[in-house]
């Protein structure tokens, strides 16, 4: 069930410059929260997530309670938006499985949230993105270019997300499309996968800065891919 908390696009008179609008998924996650906090100063942000109690809210942030996977069957129930200048796909799930361990249900659960939902949400917002000549940012991962024996499903979804971004960029030349691929980042997702020293991984705020760079690219350019890596790779640390 979606509860947009009576969300509507910010009002403005015809003589005013329209308020820029950003839509961010994964709003209750560590990375999503930082992205929202960074963009909220310049955009009206629609923060999408499943937990009403955890969603941020302010004059410049409208919380939108939505289950993106349920929306694949029920339709994406979204606020009525006139334009979307920035769409950031930050929602994802990651559980380690080998090929032997992974069941069809495991594959479907990861593909639905990590690939199918971004594709469908983008499709639903294409008219608004076209109108604003907006930017779509897909949060990928180092796993999008590599694969590991114990993390095959997550890596497969992130490889697919690259293909989605690259195809969208070709089919929608009026929309800028970027992949931002962070390495290990200090988020609840990473905490669920491994033990680590937070000082040795990427701070979520640094990923938000990379996204800021993408959305502020000049009008004649688009940054198609940014790899965000730890200052010193984990395997090189002494």
Residue map of PLM features:
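Conserved NAD(P)H cofactor-binding loop of Rossmann-fold oxidoreductase domains
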Residues: 90-96
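Active-site helix of classical SDR
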Residues: 122, 157
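Substrate-binding pocket helix/loop in short-chain dehydrogenase/reductase
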Residues: 98-99, 106-108
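C-terminal helical subdomain
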Residues: 175, 179, 196-237
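Rossmann-fold cofactor-recognition segment
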Residues: 59-72
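N-terminal Rossmann NAD(P)H-binding glycine-rich loop of SDR-like oxidoreductase domains
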Residues: 28, 32-36
């Amino acid at each position: 069930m979606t509860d947009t908390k009576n969300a509507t696009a910010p009002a403005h008179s015809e003589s005013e410059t329209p308020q820029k609008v950003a839509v961010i998924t994964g709003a209750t996650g560590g990375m999503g929260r930082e992205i929202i906090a960074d963009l909220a100063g310049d955009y009206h942000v629609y923060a999408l997530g499943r937990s009403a109690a955890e969603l941020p809210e302010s004059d410049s942030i409208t919380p939108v309670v939505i289950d993106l996977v349920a929306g694949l069957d029920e339709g994406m129930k979204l606020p009525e938006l006139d334009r979307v200048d920035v769409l950031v796909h930050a929602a994802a799930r990651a559980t380690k499985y080998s090929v032997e361990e992974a069941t069809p249900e495991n594959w479907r659960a990861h593909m639905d949230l990590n690939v199918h939902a971004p594709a469908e949400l983008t499709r639903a917002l294409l008219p608004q993105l076209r109108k604003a000549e907006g930017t779509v940012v897909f949060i990928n991962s180092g796993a999008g270019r590599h694969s590991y024996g114990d993390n095959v499903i997550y890596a497969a979804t992130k490889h697919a997300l690259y293909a989605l971004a690259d195809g969208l960029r070709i089919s929608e030349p009026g929309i800028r499309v970027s992949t931002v691929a962070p390495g290990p980042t200090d988020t609840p997702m990473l905490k669920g996968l491994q033990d680590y020293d937070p000082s040795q991984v990427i701070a979520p705020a640094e990923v938000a800065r990379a996204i800021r760079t993408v959305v502020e690219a000049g009008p004649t350019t688009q940054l198609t891919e940014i790899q965000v890596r730890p200052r010193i790779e984990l395997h090189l640390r002494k």
